[in-house]
């Protein structure tokens, strides 16, 4: 009993002592922790106090440094500006020189004029390692690089120009070097009569109320039918093929025209399409070109036979009037038609031929009369 009473008295005291010890321990621990925490923060701040806080701009440089940097930047910008101007002037000069060379000289002439320069550029000067200044050495290297670069640029220009001229040639030159097939051996003596289309055999007109209309020239049927017996007849026009072929089919249903040549067979030069008679695969001594614009529309005016342009005149007889001269040529077969045509001096051949024929008949009759007189 006494032990129970003693135990009940001691337990509350032990509990109080225990709670006091816990309070002291916790207070010391808390003071220790707080002290260590604040001391840690303070030490950390002191260690990194020389660096700016995060996400803050750096301090401005001193005024002298800033002024020097601005001056250096200004010089760099000025240097780049001058360099840009120099490159622009160099590019402009190169473009102008290229354009002038392309306009003034052919590719063969440019190749011949620059041949010596390009050959000298390939001979790079030998740089000796001893006995030469460093500046001279670099100057020699720069000179060699400039010469080599210029020579390569010229080679590239010639290559590109050749490619471009080949492409342009496909549009300006006739489709083939031989526009007509070979003449049959039995027809080697036959002359070739080349006829223009517009204002020569027909006339194309446009009016608002009816649109385009094509009119045959008076006498064209008789002209083709009669001369088809003596000549190889070829139509050579500067119009598109889609126009030439159907028009010729309606113009010549009997097939007196053997071949039809359109714009693709012409040579484009100085903004105009020319007939190149040298590409017909025929003897130029036996070619006659009849056109209302004969001397202006062919590259061989010495083969031209001019005729009055047809402009829908009802009394036009130019084709019929030309038949006697063309028949005379076909029957007599001159060795070269070109001096014969040159003797007419670009006059109206049909009228001039009739006048010459009449004069010849008069002279012939006079000679016959004189012969009879002497025989008496």
Swiss-Prot record:
Recorded hits in Pfam families, A to Z, give:
NIF
Kindly indicate whether the keyword Membrane belongs to this entry.
Answer: yes
Q: Which residue intervals are annotated with compositional bias (Polar residues) in the record?
A: 32-48
The lineage's top-level taxon is Eukaryota
The recorded induction information for this protein reads: Up-regulated after antimycin A or rotenone treatments.
Q: Transmembrane residues, as ranges?
A: 85-107
Concerning InterPro entries, the annotation shows: FCP1_dom, HAD-like_sf, HAD_sf, TIM50
A Gene Ontology annotation in the biological process aspect, one of them, is: protein transport
Q: Which GO terms describe its cellular component?
A: mitochondrial inner membrane; mitochondrion; nucleus
Give the Mitochondrial matrix membrane side ranges: 26-84
- The stretch annotated as transit peptide is 1-25
- Quote the SUPFAM superfamilies the UniProt record gives: HAD-like (SSF56784)
Q: Cite the residue spans of the region called Disordered.
A: 32-66
Q: Where is the composition biased (Pro residues)?
A: 51-64
Tissue occurrence: Expressed in young cotyledons, roots, flowers and leaves.
List residues in topological domain: Mitochondrial intermembrane: 108-376
| Residues annotated as domain FCP1 homology | 186-329
| Cited SMART domains | CPDc
Q: Which PANTHER family match?
A: DULLARD PROTEIN PHOSPHATASE
According to the record's subunit comment, the protein's assembly and interactions are: Component of the TIM17:23 complex at least composed of TIM23, TIM17 and TIM50. Interacts with TIM23-2.
Q: What is this protein called?
A: Mitochondrial import inner membrane translocase subunit TIM50
């Amino acid at each position: 009993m006494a032990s129970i009473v003693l135990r009940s008295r001691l337990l509350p005291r032990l509990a109080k002592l225990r709670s006091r010890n816990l309070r002291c321990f916790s207070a010391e621990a808390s003071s220790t922790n707080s002290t260590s925490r604040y001391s840690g923060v303070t030490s950390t701040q002191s260690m990194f106090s020389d660096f700016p806080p995060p996400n803050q701009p750096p301090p401005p440089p001193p005024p002298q440094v800033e002024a020097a940097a601005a001056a250096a930047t200004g010089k760099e910008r000025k240097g780049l500006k001058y360099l840009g101007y120099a490159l622009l002037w160099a590019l402009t000069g190169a473009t102008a020189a290229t354009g002038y060379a392309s306009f003034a000289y052919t590719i063969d002439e440019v190749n011949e004029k620059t041949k010596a320069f390009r050959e000298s550029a390939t001979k790079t000067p030998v740089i000796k390692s001893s006995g030469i200044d460093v500046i001279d050495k670099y100057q020699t290297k720069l000179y060699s690089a400039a010469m080599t670069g210029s020579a390569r640029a010229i080679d590239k220009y010639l290559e590109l120009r050749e490619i471009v001229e080949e492409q342009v040639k496909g549009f300006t030159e006739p489709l083939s070097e031989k526009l007509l097939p070979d003449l049959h051996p039995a027809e080697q003596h036959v002359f070739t009569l080349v006829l223009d289309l517009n204002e020569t055999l027909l006339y194309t007109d446009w009016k608002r109320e009816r649109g385009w209309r094509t009119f045959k020239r008076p006498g064209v049927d008789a002209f083709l039918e009669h001369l088809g017996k003596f000549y190889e007849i070829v139509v050579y026009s500067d119009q598109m093929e889609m126009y030439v072929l159907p028009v010729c089919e309606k113009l010549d249903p009997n097939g007196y025209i053997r071949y039809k040549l359109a714009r693709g067979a012409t040579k484009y030069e100085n903004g105009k399409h020319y007939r190149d008679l040298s590409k017909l695969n025929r003897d130029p001594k036996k070619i006659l070109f009849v056109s209302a614009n004969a001397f202006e529309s062919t590259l061989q005016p010495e083969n031209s036979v001019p005729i009055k342009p047809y402009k829908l005149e009802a009394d036009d007889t130019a084709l019929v009037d030309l038949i006697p001269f063309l028949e005379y040529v076909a029957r007599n077969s001159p060795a070269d038609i070109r001096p014969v045509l040159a003797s007419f001096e670009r006059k109206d051949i049909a009228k001039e031929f009739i006048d010459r024929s009449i004069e010849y008949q008069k002279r012939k009759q006079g000679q016959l009369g004189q012969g009879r007189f002497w025989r008496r």
